[in-house]
């Protein structure tokens, strides 16, 4: 996203990423990046690294709170995390996830939830799952002046209905992904996440839509990429998603540091004279 500098210029603060910058990036053919973040520490690091947007995802249910799925996550649990990220992000665009059960019953419930996130957290947009089935909710939120990021393909909040973590859009299912993408765009979303969608289907959607597409396991032919940060940083236990390249192994680094601390305390090496008053 060349139109928004990733490093702070001589002025006191860097220029904030806005929805128009994602649209400009699509039109210019420059790809942008997003990461999940759930706290001030990682938000500051990713912001300073030049990541364009930070998603405070309901994936915090797994990565922060220890739930097996995202379904138990509540609005009350997610709001403090979103607030922490928004405080730290000086440049990055902050998106708040709407958790399961906070928007499905209709447009008015969706608007109430979105307004609460915007008023209480400092987020710049909200994200919700679903294509055609969520179009009215998206439209109602957008009409109230709140930017919405859509999310189609594999939608984790619907994993039981989808039969598990399965790629969406294969074979005849491709047309449903395309229809969902157009429904999200027509409802007024400024961008749409395509999760676990075949690369050729994601490419078709990207070519057909005017708004930017964001891939999560959707191949290279999209406008931006999004990853859960614990996946690429080596913190995920068990099977790491195929689409998540591991850029670091921070779990081993922290484990070794904790062991060194334990051993030095046990042996009397720490604290030494230099750590004492």
From Swiss-Prot:
Keyword Kinase in record: no
Record-level GO BP terms: pantothenate biosynthetic process
Pathway terms, separated by semicolons: Cofactor biosynthesis; (R)-pantothenate biosynthesis; (R)-pantoate from 3-methyl-2-oxobutanoate: step 1/2
Reactions mediated catalytically: 3-methyl-2-oxobutanoate + (6R)-5,10-methylene-5,6,7,8-tetrahydrofolate + H2O = 2-dehydropantoate + (6S)-5,6,7,8-tetrahydrofolate
Residues binding Mg(2+): 58, 97, 129
Cofactor: binding details: Binds 1 Mg(2+) ion per subunit.
Gene Ontology CC: cytoplasm
Any Pfam family hit: Pantoate_transf
InterPro entries xrefs: Pantoate_hydroxy_MeTrfase, Pyrv/PenolPyrv_kinase-like_dom, Pyrv_kinase-like_dom_sf
Known EC number: 2.1.2.11
Subcellular location: Cytoplasm
Keyword Magnesium appears in the UniProt entry: yes
GO molecular function annotations of the record: 3-methyl-2-oxobutanoate hydroxymethyltransferase activity; magnesium ion binding
Cofactor(s), names only, from the UniProt record: Mg(2+)
Active site: 195 (proton acceptor)
Disulfide bonds: none
Binding site for 3-methyl-2-oxobutanoate: 58-59, 97, 127
Entry keywords, A to Z: Cytoplasm, Magnesium, Metal-binding, Pantothenate biosynthesis, Transferase
Record text on subunit structure and interactions: Homodecamer; pentamer of dimers.
PANTHER family referenced in this protein's UniProt entry, alphabetically: 3-METHYL-2-OXOBUTANOATE HYDROXYMETHYLTRANSFERASE
Protein purpose: Catalyzes the reversible reaction in which hydroxymethyl group from 5,10-methylenetetrahydrofolate is transferred onto alpha-ketoisovalerate to form ketopantoate.
Family: Belongs to the PanB family.
Identification of the protein by name: 3-methyl-2-oxobutanoate hydroxymethyltransferase
Organism: Leifsonia xyli subsp. xyli (strain CTCB07)
């Amino acid at each position: 996203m060349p139109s928004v500098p990733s490093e702070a210029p001589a002025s006191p603060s860097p220029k904030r990423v806005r929805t128009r910058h994602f649209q400009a990036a699509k039109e210019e053919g420059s790809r942008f990046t997003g990461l999940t973040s759930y706290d001030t520490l990682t938000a500051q690091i990713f912001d300073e690294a030049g990541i364009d947007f930070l998603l405070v995802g309901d994936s915090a249910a797994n990565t922060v709170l220890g739930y097996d799925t995202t379904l138990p996550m509540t609005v009350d649990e997610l709001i403090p995390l979103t607030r922490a990220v928004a405080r730290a992000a000086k440049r990055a665009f902050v998106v708040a996830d709407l958790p399961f059960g906070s928007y499905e019953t209709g447009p008015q419930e969706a608007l109430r939830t979105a307004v609460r996130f915007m008023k209480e957290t400092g987020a710049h947009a909200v994200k919700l799952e679903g294509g055609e089935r969520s179009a009215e909710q998206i439209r109602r939120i957008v009409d109230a002046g709140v930017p919405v990021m859509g999310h189609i393909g594999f939608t984790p909040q619907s994993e039981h209905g989808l039969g598990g973590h399965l790629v969406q859009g294969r074979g005849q299912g491709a047309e449903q992904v395309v229809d969902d993408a157009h429904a999200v765009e027509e409802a007024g979303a400024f961008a749409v996440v395509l999760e676990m969608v075949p690369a050729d289907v994601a490419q078709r959607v990207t070519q057909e839509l005017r708004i930017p597409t964001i891939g999560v396991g959707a191949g290279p032919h999209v406008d931006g990429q999004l990853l859960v940060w614990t996946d690429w940083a080596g913190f995920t236990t068990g099977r790491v998603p195929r689409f998540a390249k591991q850029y670091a192994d921070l779990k081993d680094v922290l484990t070794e540091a904790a062991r060194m601390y334990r051993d030095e305390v046990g042996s009397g090496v720490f604290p030494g004279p230099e750590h004492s008053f």
